[in-house]
């Protein structure tokens, strides 16, 4: 099984790895990776793999999880790369940092604003989708008072400027279910194969089960702006927000 490097270090930009297998000359599984695979509403990382033997470069255009494997879809960058990667090759992975860091800001911001909506409005978060320019949060809320969301934005931005530390933990599934009441329900939805749960804690604010990439403190978000609110029928609502740069 691939060692997941971003679970405890989201700021790792480069890493060394060994190719374990290659499918159709372009789907590469490594023994360890810092590339984030698309999941949980967060798009995948991109970047490149550089073969140690000859410096041949391969662009990583997409990363996904298939049948338990983290698969890196590659395309050759130069002539040497046309030979392709094979099992046993040693490579250096390089993350597209601008893209990764933008998603980190978006993801931690999503936890902040979602927590505010839950606490202040009593909403139940039902989904999210991150983007580079804007992200969305879906939630269930019967009394949909749009005017209150300006206040929720202010509360979220106050949390952001307070520079709350963000901590990452890997705990056993049993520990998560026993000690954290909120995770008891969430963990029941996990595959039985999952023995460890990755937790993301914003100190003094919230702790969630989440596999995404996050910042070290809320201050790095800088700020958010709620762009649009939508009524999706019955009690289903949607909110779009952007980052302040």
Curated annotation (Swiss-Prot):
SMART domains referenced in this protein's UniProt entry, alphabetically: tRNA_SAD
UniProt keyword annotations, A-Z: Cytoplasm, Metal-binding, Zinc
Pfam families: tRNA-synt_2c, tRNA_SAD
Record-level GO cellular component terms: cytoplasm
Cell compartments where the protein resides: Cytoplasm
A GO BP annotation: alanyl-tRNA aminoacylation
InterPro entries according to UniProt: Ala-tRNA-synth_IIc_core, Ala-tRNA-synth_IIc_N, Alanyl-tRNA_Edit-Domain, Alanyl-tRNA_Editing_Enzymes, Thr/Ala-tRNA-synth_IIc_edit, Transl_B-barrel_sf, tRNA_SAD
GO molecular function annotation: alanine-tRNA ligase activity; aminoacyl-tRNA deacylase activity; ATP binding; metal ion binding; nucleic acid binding
Binding site for Zn(2+): 107, 111, 210, 214
Family: Belongs to the class-II aminoacyl-tRNA synthetase family. Editing domain AlaX-M subfamily.
Cofactor: binding details: Binds 1 zinc ion per subunit.
Cofactor requirements of the protein: Zn(2+)
Transmembrane spans: none
Role according to the record: Functions in trans to edit the amino acid moiety from mischarged charged tRNA(Ala).
Protein name per UniProt: Alanyl-tRNA editing protein AlaX-M
The keyword Cytoplasm is annotated on this UniProt entry: yes
Superkingdom in the source lineage: Archaea
């Amino acid at each position: 099984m691939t060692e997941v490097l971003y679970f405890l270090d989201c700021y790792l930009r480069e890493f060394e790895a060994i190719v374990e297998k290659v499918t159709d000359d372009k789907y590469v599984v490594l023994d360890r990776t810092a590339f984030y695979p698309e999941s949980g509403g967060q798009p995948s990382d991109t970047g490149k793999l550089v073969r140690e033997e000859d410096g041949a470069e391969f662009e990583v255009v997409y990363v996904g999880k298939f049948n338990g494997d983290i698969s890196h879809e590659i395309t050759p960058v130069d002539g040497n790369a046309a030979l392709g990667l094979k099992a046993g090759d040693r490579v250096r992975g390089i993350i597209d940092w601008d893209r990764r860091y933008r998603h980190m800001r978006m993801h931690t911001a999503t936890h902040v604003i979602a927590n505010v909506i839950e606490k202040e409005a009593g909403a139940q978060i039902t989904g999210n989708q991150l983007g580079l320019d804007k992200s969305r949060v879906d939630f269930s809320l019967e009394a949909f008072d749009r005017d209150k969301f300006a206040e929720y934005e202010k509360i979220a931005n106050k949390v952001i400027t307070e520079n709350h530390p963000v901590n990452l933990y890997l705990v056993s599934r049993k520990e998560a279910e026993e000690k954290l009441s909120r995770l008891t329900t969430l963990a029941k939805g996990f595959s039985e194969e999952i023995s460890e749960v990755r937790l993301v804690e914003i100190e003094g604010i919230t702790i969630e089960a989440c596999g995404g990439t996050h910042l070290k403190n809320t201050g790095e978000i800088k700020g958010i702006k709620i762009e649009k609110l939508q009524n999706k029928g019955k009690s289903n609502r949607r909110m779009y927000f952007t980052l302040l740069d």
